[in-house]
């Protein structure tokens, strides 16, 4: 708990020093979250509804196919931008889903809507 809390606070401080804004939301690594952190830090966890397991493959087509065949309204897609294949897939996913009529919104818009 203490290590996670420190990492979140350090990240918030780094983001605030650049943007002048504090973190409101975060994606917990591995989806592991403890309610106590939410209360202590005033940060809301944002979980995902589609995980194409992009970290297990470099096959862009496989990642794209998994997402676009599963995507439904209000889904949150988990991708890792540290992999070139995931970045390439994300660009294709956005184009395909927009062609299908999907709209991409901020977390604020999704949660408050």
Per-range role (PLM):
Residues 1-113:
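Catalytic domains of cell-wall/extracellular-matrix polysaccharide-remodeling enzymes
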